[in-house]
């Protein structure tokens, strides 16, 4: 296993090889020290937002193959040795040259805030006058909320005058007060919990009291009316508006206005409540209102209970009991804004907490579950139940490639997909089983059969794990799984009991086109009508089969179950046997036609990302260590014998060669460029709306890839170019919008059902009545390049 270690600034990146999932963090630090020359005590390692601490393993942090760990180097503190040196290192802030405040200055307010707080009541008493302003104490007015621009019913409780600024002379107090200098202290009728609010004179006016009749409304008239910007068909708050048009029919009356929302406005809004249009009262025109006036109807503050005080509501009242009593004993959660009685909590509180912030039990973060920097990880219940956690064996099981985990996942088809995987031709080769899992051809890392006992088998691996297997290329006899003691963390064992037709054995039997029979087996009369099974041959099968690949794993196409039956195997126990026969249009990779096709497509062995670099580093280290040993022997006149009477022998190749190493072939195979069929080229030319995208894709055919086949490079380019912005998959039933973006029809339908009528990629307004037409040329090309990719979508 290998990983990447990168410094925080991104300047240095090194591959750390020869690791295990059970490698300790302190061991990793020593390897990093050899590469980065940083002491372990100065290393801070971060992975997925967590600081890695000693005592844990890579498995504890779930570090996977070729993942990147960030390295932050601690700076060693060097204290000044003399007073002169210490004085020279003073910052600009300490020496008084800094323009901003120092930390001590920032923490000190110099008495400014306190003076402002202490002097405010004195100033208000000094400038409190009863003869100021147009509106007097206890008069009913309309006050405007400066945030939303709506007018609310309020009552004046106090009138004051602004204190003179420092630039004005003190004699200005004797001049008559202007309306702009007046401050009104008002209290909202519907929101007494807000207390007394100070308002400028421009945000206060006489209470609206006159309803304008329909026949008196005129275009261009400025009035006050009810409107809801969020839900125009429901009752909202009261806004100023200018009437833009008016229309009356035999059955309805329509009124449109430009609604003023503070500094902004909404144009041509249809007004629902045309019988509740109020005249704006001008200052000094009417008599002041001191009696209880008629109340206007506004939208309910709670849409759940419609402000019904007799109804329990868990939205606007206590979230637990729904009661409205004891508002002074309610706490508001700073996260969800829900109210809670202190005696409804579990456990209940005796008093309101003095903290500024409070969170309800559903929103608060459990401090015991938070892992701070420098703390050890919490014990995982899931990992505590694993066999590796309870095993007393000291074997390092974390070095195998089956333990590293997938770095990516096949999503172009679902996991229960029958038949070929789109974009994976017959003859595709992978070095490790985990890569086969990532491609989607055979998803289990270790198991030989992938399937479900109530559905069927989707794929299997022919690896020679059972001595009863017989391989003839186009057909083979396969042995079921089970009958072995794999307790603990074992990968394989000898046959120790009879197999049963359950689990994956039953799944593979369901692929046979015959009724299931768990006693005697069954044989299909029409075996081609059975469910397809993807077959992968492994290099381990080469001990019993000449059709196995020379290295790694190879996809050999589609096979179908002809029959299955129980019999006593070579081990003496009952095993289930399956006869599978090849049913694939693509030639087998061991035939001459198959080899020519592999050469034409340029299919080569695929290695995990970073594998070749790690292997090269490992061989380089071996060569360096070998050279050092030879130099030491030559310098010390050592005997060429190494060990007990054994002579050291150099290989003819100049160094040890590793079986299965990608460096053993020096001759490069000439790769033919991939070319489209005449039908595919015609369909691409027909898709004129995506001509620019196709030009970019076709340009990739001219590029010669450094690794991989041109065919797979072309498919990956197509998949990247025609990816749906919504589902992040290859577009299916594509809709090419007028703004030249491709979206799945199902994704666009879902967007329209959510009342979003714009392009998901660029927000271009498509309109409610947009006609969705599937781009058939594009869909046909994608079906030919990725056959079956629409299954399950």
UniProtKB/Swiss-Prot annotation:
Q: Where is this site: Required to confer preferential recognition of cytosine over thymine?
A: 479
Tell me which residues make up the YDG domain: 419-582
Find the cross-link Glycyl lysine isopeptide (Lys-Gly) (interchain with G-Cter in SUMO2). Answer: 279, 385, 546, 670
- CDD domains cross-referenced by the UniProt entry: PHD_UHRF1, RING-HC_UHRF1, Tudor_UHRF1_rpt1, Tudor_UHRF1_rpt2, Ubl_UHRF1
Q: What is the effect of changing residue 639 to A?
A: Prevents phosphorylation by CDK1 during M phase, leading to increased stability
Q: Which domain of life is it from?
A: Eukaryota
One Pfam family recorded for the sequence? ubiquitin
Name assigned to this protein: E3 ubiquitin-protein ligase UHRF1
Q: Which organism is it from?
A: Homo sapiens
Q: Which gene encodes it?
A: UHRF1
């Amino acid at each position: 296993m290998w990983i990447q270690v990168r410094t925080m600034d991104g300047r240095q990146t090194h591959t750390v090889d020869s690791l295990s999932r059970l490698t300790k963090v302190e061991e990793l630090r020593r390897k990093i020290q050899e590469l980065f020359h940083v002491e372990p005590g100065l290393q801070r390692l971060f992975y997925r937002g967590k600081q890695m601490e000693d005592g844990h393993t890579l498995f504890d942090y779930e570090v996977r193959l070729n993942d990147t760990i960030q390295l932050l180097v601690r700076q060693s503190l060097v204290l000044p040795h003399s007073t002169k040196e210490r004085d020279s290192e003073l910052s600009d802030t300490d020496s008084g040259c800094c323009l901003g405040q120092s930390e001590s200055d920032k923490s000190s307010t110099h008495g400014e805030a306190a003076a402002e707080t202490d002097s405010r009541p004195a100033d208000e008493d000094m400038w409190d006058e009863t003869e100021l302003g147009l509106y007097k104490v206890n008069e009913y007015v309309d006050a405007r909320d400066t945030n939303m621009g709506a007018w609310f019913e309020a009552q004046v409780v106090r009138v004051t005058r602004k204190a003179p600024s420092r630039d004005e002379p003190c004699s200005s107090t004797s001049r008559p007060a202007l309306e702009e200098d007046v401050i009104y202290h008002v209290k909202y009728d519907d929101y007494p919990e807000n207390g007394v609010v100070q308002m400028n004179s421009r945000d206060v006016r006489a209470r609206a009291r006159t309803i304008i009749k329909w026949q008196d409304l005129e275009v261009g008239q400025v009035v006050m009316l009810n409107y809801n910007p969020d839900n125009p068909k429901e009752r909202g708050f009261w806004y100023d508006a200018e009437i833009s048009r008016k229309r009356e029919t035999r059955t309805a009356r329509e009124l449109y206005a430009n609604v003023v929302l503070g500094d902004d406005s909404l144009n041509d809004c249809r007004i629902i409540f045309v019988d509740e249009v109020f005249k704006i009262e001008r200052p000094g025109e009417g008599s002041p209102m001191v009696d209880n006036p008629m109340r206007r109807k506004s939208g309910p503050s709670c849409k759940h209970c419609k402000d019904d005080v007799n109804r329990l509501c868990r939205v606007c009242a206590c979230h637990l009991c729904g009661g409205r009593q004891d508002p002074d004993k309610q706490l508001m959660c700073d996260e969800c804004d829900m109210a809670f009685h202190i005696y409804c909590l579990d456990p209940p509180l005796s008093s309101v907490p003095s903290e500024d912030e409070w969170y309800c039990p559903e929103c608060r973060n459990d401090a015991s579950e938070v892992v701070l920097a420098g703390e050890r990880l919490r014990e995982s219940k899931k990992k505590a139940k694993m066999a590796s956690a309870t095993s007393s064996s000291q074997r390092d099981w974390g070095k195998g490639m089956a333990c590293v985990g997938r770095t990516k996942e096949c999503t172009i088809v679902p996991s229960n997909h029958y038949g070929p995987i789109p974009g994976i031709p017959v003859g595709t080769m992978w070095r490790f089983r985990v890569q086969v899992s990532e491609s989607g051809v055979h998803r289990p890392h270790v198991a030989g059969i992938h399937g479900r006992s109530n559905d069927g088998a989707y794929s299997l691996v022919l690896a020679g794990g059972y001595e009863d297997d017989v391989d003839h290329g186009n057909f083979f006899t396969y042995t079921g799984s089970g009958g072995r003691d794999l307790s603990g963390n074992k990968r394989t064992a000898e046959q120790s009991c009879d197999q049963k037709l359950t689990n994956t054995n039953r799944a593979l039997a369901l692929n046979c086109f015959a009724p299931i029979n768990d006693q005697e087996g069954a044989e299909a009369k029409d075996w081609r009508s059975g469910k397809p099974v993807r077959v992968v041959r492994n290099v381990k099968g080469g001990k019993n089969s000449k059709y196995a690949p020379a290295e790694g794993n190879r996809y050999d196409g589609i096979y179908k179950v002809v029959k299955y039956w129980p019999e006593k195997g070579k081990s003496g126990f009952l095993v289930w046997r399956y006869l599978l026969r090849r049913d694939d249009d693509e030639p087998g990779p061991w035939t001459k036609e198959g080899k020519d096709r592999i050469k034409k497509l340029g299919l080569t062995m695929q290695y995990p990302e970073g594998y070749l670099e790690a292997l090269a580093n490992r061989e380089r280290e071996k060569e360096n260590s070998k050279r050092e040993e030879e130099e030491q022997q030559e310098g010390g006149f050592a005997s060429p014998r190494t060990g007990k009477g054994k002579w050291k022998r150099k290989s003819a190749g100049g160094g040890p060669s590793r079986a299965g190493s990608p460096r053993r072939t020096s001759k490069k195979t000439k790769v033919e460029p991939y070319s489209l069929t005449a039908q595919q080229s015609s369909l691409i030319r027909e898709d004129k709306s995506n001509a620019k995208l196709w030009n970019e894709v076709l340009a990739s055919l001219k590029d010669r890839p450094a690794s991989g086949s041109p065919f797979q490079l072309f498919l990956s380019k197509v998949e990247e170019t025609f990816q749906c912005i919504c589902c992040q998959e290859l577009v299916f039933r594509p809709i090419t919008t007028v703004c030249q973006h491709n979206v799945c029809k199902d994704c666009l339908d879902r967007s329209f059902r959510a009342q979003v009528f714009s392009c998901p990629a660029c927000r271009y307004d498509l309109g409610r009545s947009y006609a969705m037409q599937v781009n058939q040329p594009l869909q046909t090309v994608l079906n030919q390049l990725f056959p079956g990719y629409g299954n399950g979508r």
